[in-house]
């Protein structure tokens, strides 16, 4: 091994950028606290070749067909909407990260999960680093989650928390939250990047190594930053098996759990909940809940059907176009601002509507985030409805993607979207060309471009008013 040595590098855990010395902030991605010292092997080709020599495996490789799939089967949590997102339930030995804004209802949801888990004959342990056991007990009484197989421990030291797991021997562990846990095996302050990564790594290793029937399934609560990202390095998401985002507007009781990553099922599913003073409940038909709260037809509103994973959901867009008191303003909520600006520019250019010289306000109802391109046409018709001061009929929807040329394009799952619209009682659908079939009771009106769609909207509105 002559001529070779171990040397140090300073590498960013976010972007893998290598710095010549330690710095607090990565010069490449600008993230704070992600530059760590790592040891690398440097030397001649002989050493590198020796380092690549094989080692006898402790267990042989086997054909994939000989592996028992039951080892990683799903265990239902008892919360149907969460099971929907998880692909059927929690997998033994898995680690799930649930992230969301403070106060959105993460602790309430997971206390309900622990209670349902206990009701199925299994034991759950709730570890809290943010609240005392007495505070959790008060919430449990308020929400009716007081099963005697739900164990509580207020602990922020990781080693002691692992001792609680060894003593209680649960099959489900909830850690609320991973940012409040600390370990003596890593430097840094509690909640810092180094500590969060070390705690998550230790918990993941424990879950994978645990034995039992079933093994321990863990759910970690994670905080989010101001821009909605999970607090801590992005490598945190790579350490866990499942990443879920808990979303919702504080002005609304509707909450959504959205799958971002899932090693055991589809990663694009969404579950719907309603938060009450006495707990949280599943909403199996969120579209019906939305329609119950919808007011009478007014100018500036349009309805569409989006697809969140495999679930069709109704979404309402509201727009307001008004003369400016100064420089024209733009305010967008629940819709991508760049896409909203693009749709406004298309209306300005293709339909000769002076959108750019007016104030424009766009919002979704109930705190929904419309990222599906199928909502483009509804956004455009909501703006046109507000500009012309004409209300679209209550039973009309719009589905389609808008191109820069003003053309309308079909979106995936059109049959499923139209079936959902017909089920909810809609009678007219404005869609792009090429839709040849429609469910009974739903009239499909095809528009070649955005100009034709706006004209169709005006004709439908006038006919509905007569």
From Swiss-Prot:
| Protein family per UniProt | Belongs to the RecA family. RadA subfamily.
- Positions of region (Lon-protease-like): 359-466
Anything noted about its domains?
Has a putative N-terminal zinc-finger, a middle region with homology to RecA with ATPase motifs including the RadA KNRFG motif, while the C-terminus is homologous to Lon protease.
The UniProt entry, under HAMAP family, shows: RadA_bact
Q: Name one GO cellular component term.
A: cytosol
Residues reported in the UniProt entry to bind ATP: 100-107
Origin superkingdom: Bacteria
Per the record, the zinc finger regions (C4-type) lie at 12-29
**Where along the sequence does the record place the motif called RadA KNRFG motif?**
261-265
Decide whether keyword Lipid biosynthesis is in the record. Answer: no
Entry keyword DNA repair: yes
NCBIfam families from the entry?
Answer: sms
Q: What does this protein do?
A: DNA-dependent ATPase involved in processing of recombination intermediates, plays a role in repairing DNA breaks. Stimulates the branch migration of RecA-mediated strand transfer reactions, allowing the 3' invading strand to extend heteroduplex DNA faster. Binds ssDNA in the presence of ADP but not other nucleotides, has ATPase activity that is stimulated by ssDNA and various branched DNA structures, but inhibited by SSB. Does not have RecA's homology-searching function. Also inhibits the diadenylate cyclase activity of DisA.
The terms under GO molecular function for this entry are:
ATP binding; ATP hydrolysis activity; ATP-dependent DNA damage sensor activity; damaged DNA binding; zinc ion binding
Query: What turns on expression?
Result: Forms part of an operon with disA.
Could you give a single Gene Ontology term from the biological process aspect? recombinational repair
Q: Which UniProt keywords apply?
A: ATP-binding, DNA damage, DNA repair, DNA-binding, Hydrolase, Metal-binding, Nucleotide-binding, Stress response, Zinc, Zinc-finger
| EC assignment | 3.6.4.-
SUPFAM superfamilies in the cross-refs: P-loop containing nucleoside triphosphate hydrolases, Ribosomal protein S5 domain 2-like
Q: How does it assemble?
A: Interacts with DisA.
Q: What is this protein called?
A: DNA repair protein RadA
């Amino acid at each position: 091994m002559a001529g070779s040595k171990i040397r140090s590098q300073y590498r960013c855990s976010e972007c893998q950028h290598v710095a010549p010395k330690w710095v607090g902030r990565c010069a490449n991605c600008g993230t704070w606290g992600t530059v760590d010292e790592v040891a690398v092997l440097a030397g001649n080709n002989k050493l590198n070749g020796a380092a690549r020599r094989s080692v006898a495996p402790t267990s042989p490789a086997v054909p994939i067909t000989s592996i028992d799939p039951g080892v990683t089967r799903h265990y239902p949590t008892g919360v149907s909407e969460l099971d929907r997102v998880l692909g059927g339930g929690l997998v033994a030995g898995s680690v799930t990260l649930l992230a969301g804004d403070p106060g959105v209802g993460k602790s309430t949801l997971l206390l309900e999960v622990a209670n349902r888990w206990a009701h199925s004959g299994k034991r759950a342990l709730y570890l809290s680093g943010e609240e005392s056991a007495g505070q959790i007990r008060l919430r449990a009484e308020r929400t009716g989650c007081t099963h005697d197989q739900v164990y509580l421990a207020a602990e922020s030291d990781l080693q002691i928390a692992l001792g609680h797991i060894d003593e209680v021997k649960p099959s489900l562990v909830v850690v609320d939250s991973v940012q409040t846990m600390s370990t003596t095996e890593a430097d840094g302050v509690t909640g810092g990047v180094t500590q969060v990564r070390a705690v998550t790594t230790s918990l993941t290793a424990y879950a994978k190594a645990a034995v039992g029937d079933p093994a321990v399934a863990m759910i970690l609560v994670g905080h989010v930053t101001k821009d909605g990202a999970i607090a801590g390095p992005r490598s945190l998401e790579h350490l866990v098996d499942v990443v879920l985002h808990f979303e919702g507007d504080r002005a609304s009781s509707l909450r959504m759990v959205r799958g971002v990553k899932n090693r055991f099922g589809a990663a694009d599913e969404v579950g719907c909940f309603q938060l009450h003073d006495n707990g949280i409940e599943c909403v199996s038909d969120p579209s019906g809940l939305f329609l119950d709260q919808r007011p009478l037809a007014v100018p500036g509103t349009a309805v569409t059907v989006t697809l969140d994973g495999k679930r069709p959901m109704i979404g309402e867009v509201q727009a307001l176009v008004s003369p400016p008191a100064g420089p024209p303003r733009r305010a967008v909520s629940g819709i991508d601002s760049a896409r909203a600006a693009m749709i406004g520019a298309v209306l300005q250019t293709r339909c000769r509507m002076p959108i750019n010289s007016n104030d424009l306000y766009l919002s979704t109802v109930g705190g929904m985030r419309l990222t599906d391109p199928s909502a483009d046409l509804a956004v455009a018709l909501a703006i046109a409805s507000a500009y012309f001061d004409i209300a679209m009929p209550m039973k009309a929807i719009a589905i389609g993607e808008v191109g820069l040329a003003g053309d309308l394009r079909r979106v995936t799952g059109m049959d499923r979207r139209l079936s959902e619209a017909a089920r909810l009682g809609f009678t007219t659908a404005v869609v792009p060309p090429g839709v040849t079939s429609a469910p009974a009771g739903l009239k499909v009106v095809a528009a070649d471009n955005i100009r034709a769609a706006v004209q169709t909207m005006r004709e439908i509105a006038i006919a509905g008013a007569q």
